[in-house]
Amino acid sequence: SCSSGCSDCNSDSCQCTLNQFTNSDSCCC
């Protein structure tokens, strides 16, 4: 699952990705 923002994306099983089209980051676990 993914949530917007990477400030709380600190888990080893999560990955922060940047959407180049919307210029927004998301945390995917």
Swiss-Prot record:
GO cellular component: extracellular region
Modified how: Contains 4 disulfide bonds.
MF annotations from Gene Ontology: toxin activity
Location in or out of the cell: Secreted
Tissues/organs with expression: Expressed by the venom duct.
Keywords for this protein: Disulfide bond, Secreted, Toxin
Keyword hit for Secreted: yes
Free-text domain note: The cysteine framework is C-C-C-C-C-CCC.
Name of the protein described by the UniProt record: Augerpeptide hheTx2
